[in-house]
Amino acid sequence: MNEQKMNEQMKKTAKTSGQKGPGGRALDRLTLKQDEARPVQNTRVEAPRVTYTIRDESEISPETEEDGFPDGYLECIIRGEFSEPILEEDFLFKSFESLEEVEQNLSRQVLEASSLLESSLEYMTKGTKQEKTEVTQETPPLRVGASSLLAGGPAEKPEGGVYCGVLSMLECPQAGCKKKLRGKTALRKHMLVHGPRRHVCAECGKAFTESSKLKRHFLVHTGEKPYQCTFEGCGKRFSLDFNLRTHIRIHTGERRFVCPFDGCEKSFIQSNNQKIHILTHAKAGKKC
């Protein structure tokens, strides 16, 4: 009876094999245990053959060299801490490129500045040359006239014909003054006489047109003569240094002022004496 019940139960489980409940699961466990209890057949399982190639350290392919990152670096990339691998070689290469660009820019700026300087110097030299040529073309050659000699100062005898017509006298335009003067400079100086006399002496009331003349006149009242001749046996004193210099020429024999006319060898210590001598040539009508 027990065996019949067992068979019926087995049939029921076979019919309901599509729907596994708790009983089905238990049956599965039972069958697994029965399978484990069975003897294992002698089956030969071959292990997979793994071949390893050992290369020298010098023989590294470019693929392994490019992908040869450290493990920690790869972990950082996987985590997302680094977006792109940054190599030291790339950084150095970029820095060298930037330095080369800077050097090129500097050299370009230096070349531009030097070319600009050369062009400006060339322009300046051209301008000065043109100005010199214009001045030499327009300006006639100057000669030393009698007016410069009459103004005083040492001079050599000029060539003949220089003083022809130069000694023409200029008449004072002031009414009642018939004085004639040599040149415009002498005339301007003479016109100060006719001007207002603003500089008045406090001692005698004499007025002067220039302050320098008032100072010179005031030495007459004071009697001051600070300039003394140092030559032995002379000892003369003068109120002005100009008079002392003129006096010293008497001792030295220096005659700086030479007659400018040809054939006349006269020379003078003072410029006033030279001017008076030149007038004698003009009055005599001596031709140049």
UniProtKB/Swiss-Prot annotation:
Stated induction or repression of this protein's expression: Up-regulated by NANOG, up-regulation which is increased by SOX2 and POU5F1. Up-regulated by nicotine; up-regulation which is prevented with tubocurarine, a nicotinic acetylcholine receptor antagonist. Down-regulated by sodium vanadate and retinoic acid (RA). In ES cells, down-regulation correlates with differentiation.
UniProt GO MF annotations: DNA-binding transcription activator activity, RNA polymerase II-specific; RNA polymerase II cis-regulatory region sequence-specific DNA binding; sequence-specific DNA binding; zinc ion binding
Subcellular localization: Nucleus
Composition bias type Basic and acidic residues, residue spans: 1-11, 26-38
Function summary: Involved in the reprogramming of X-chromosome inactivation during the acquisition of pluripotency. Required for efficient elongation of TSIX, a non-coding RNA antisense to XIST. Binds DXPas34 enhancer within the TSIX promoter. Involved in ES cell self-renewal.
Region Disordered, annotated ranges: 1-48
Gene3D superfamilies: Classic Zinc Finger
One Pfam family recorded for the sequence: zf-C2H2
UniProt PTM: Polyubiquitinated by RNF12, leading to proteasomal degradation.
Keyword DNA-binding in annotation: yes
Tissues showing expression: Restricted to testis, to germ cells in the early stages of spermatogenesis. Not expressed in spermatids, nor spermatozoa. Expressed in embryonic stem (ES) cells.
Family: Belongs to the krueppel C2H2-type zinc-finger protein family.
Cross-link (Glycyl lysine isopeptide (Lys-Gly) (interchain with G-Cter in ubiquitin)): 213, 215
SUPFAM superfamilies: beta-beta-alpha zinc fingers (SSF57667)
GO BP: any one term: positive regulation of transcription by RNA polymerase II
InterPro entries the UniProt entry points to: Znf_C2H2_sf, Znf_C2H2_type
GO CC term (a single one): protein-containing complex
Keyword Transcription regulation: yes
Keyword entries, A-Z: Activator, DNA-binding, Isopeptide bond, Metal-binding, Nucleus, Repeat, Transcription, Transcription regulation, Ubl conjugation, Zinc, Zinc-finger
Main location: nucleus
Protein name: Zinc finger protein 42
Residue ranges covered by zinc fingers (C2H2-type): 170-194, 199-221, 227-251, 258-281
